[in-house]
Amino acid sequence: VMINGDWNEETPLGKAEWIKFFGALYGLDKKADSIFTNIEKEYNKTVALAKTAKTNPTVLVGSMFNNQWFVPKGNSWGCLFIKEAQGNYLWSDEKGTGGLSLSFETVLEQAKTADFWIGPGSFDSLKQMTDSNIHYNQFESLQAKNV
């Protein structure tokens, strides 16, 4: 029995590096190392490109689940991912690496005008999103189709 601890990682590259663990399990160490090296190179190139951005768009993350909206705290890998892309993550001031459980009203108050909405769940279309929760229509990022 092995326990996968990738959820403990605090950086995007830390999460990607778990490919080496799985490569070792299947005797594919060299291939996994090569894949990770490529991911690392491309990630760092993308971060360098993002630093030239002229704007810092606001970013909303997640969606409702069991009447709660879960978002990552400010020191999580997801927040770092957005920060390195020059995004303005709306809960970046929240200390820690876990998640926050928020009400819809709290999220709407803070993120109604967010420029982008990422990771909204397993919806196949914007229509499917709004069919699941009509209140999603209140977010400007959805209205602008920046989801």
Residue ranges and their predicted role:
Residues 1-67:
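Extracytoplasmic substrate-binding proteins
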Residues 41-134:
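Flexible, glycine-rich surface segments
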Residues 23, 32, 85-87, 91, ...:
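Small-side-chain structural scaffolding
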Residues 12-13, 20-24, 69-84, 146-147:
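Extracytoplasmic metal-acquisition and chelation regions
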